[in-house]
Amino acid sequence: MSRGSSAGFDRHITIFSPEGRLYQVEYAFKAINQGGLTSVAVRGKDCAVIVTQKKVPDKLLDSSTVTHLFKITESIGCVMTGMTADSRSQVQRARYEAANWKYKYGYEIPVDMLCKRIADISQVYTQNAEMRPLGCCMILIGIDEEQGPQVYKCDPAGYYCGFKATAAGVKQTESTSFLEKKVKKKFDWTFEQTVETAITCLSTVLSIDFKPSEIEVGVVTVENPKFRILTEAEIDAHLVALAERD
């Protein structure tokens, strides 16, 4: 057996390969791309926005029941990229952790603490042989009472961080470089600019002109810190504004 091959080292989640890699955890990152979707999150001056594709895999499905945006608390929302069942399980756990925090401490959990908690749980999944990492990536948005708008992302390895803008899924690399260029030029976007930057990023990297039914947009703003999902009419207004500008 050559030392470079992954033979034997990807059987167990808890064994390092001779190169110091955990193959099962790396495979979990590949699983995020299985759904074929890309999600983008952008933080503005007084808002945070998440945008993801909405693909209905089957003609007979009721499209109103297909979603990748979830409300965790009144004021924290998330977009899940990756395997749908794993995503729902992680969202359920996040809701439990948020409710638990509220019960224990008497106030809503901040976005960064929720992300840290989910990352801690994911990290344990990379240590124990009887568990497997979840094949999904969670991007959280919310308004922090002290810090203002927040975007946090947590991955199957248990790594988490706050972002000005970030992406996950199939076109993550392309989206990230697009967002880096945008953020370098300007960063204190208004609400409209933030939503439109996120939508432009997604449509540019996928080379698609979206119809309102093909994307989902979730927002939180300082004026209205409750997480809400935009209606198709609202998304259409943003798409029209973008088209007129082009």
From Swiss-Prot:
Stated induction or repression of this protein's expression: Up-regulated in liver tumor tissues (at protein level).
Protein name in UniProt: Proteasome subunit alpha type-6
Modified residues (N6-acetyllysine): K102, K104
Tissues with expression: Detected in liver (at protein level).
Record-level Gene Ontology MF annotations: NF-kappaB binding; RNA binding
Residues annotated as glycosylated: S5
Matching PROSITE patterns: PROTEASOME_ALPHA_1, PROTEASOME_ALPHA_2
Keywords: Acetylation, Cytoplasm, Glycoprotein, Nucleus, Phosphoprotein, Proteasome
Phosphoserine PTM sites in chain numbering: S17, S63, S64
InterPro entries noted in UniProt: Ntn_hydrolases_N, Proteasome_alpha, Proteasome_alpha-type, Proteasome_asu_N, Proteasome_sua/b, Proteasome_subunit_alpha6
Location of Phosphotyrosine modifications: Y159
GO cellular component: cilium; cytoplasm; cytosol; mitochondrion; myofibril; nuclear matrix; nucleoplasm; P-body
Biological-process GO terms, alphabetical: positive regulation of canonical NF-kappaB signal transduction; proteolysis involved in protein catabolic process; skeletal muscle tissue development; ubiquitin-dependent protein catabolic process
Localization: Cytoplasm; Nucleus
Oligomer status and interactors: The 26S proteasome consists of a 20S proteasome core and two 19S regulatory subunits. The 20S proteasome core is a barrel-shaped complex made of 28 subunits that are arranged in four stacked rings. The two outer rings are each formed by seven alpha subunits, and the two inner rings are formed by seven beta subunits. The proteolytic activity is exerted by three beta-subunits PSMB5, PSMB6 and PSMB7. Interacts with ALKBH4.
Family statement drawn from the similarity comment of this UniProt entry: Belongs to the peptidase T1A family.
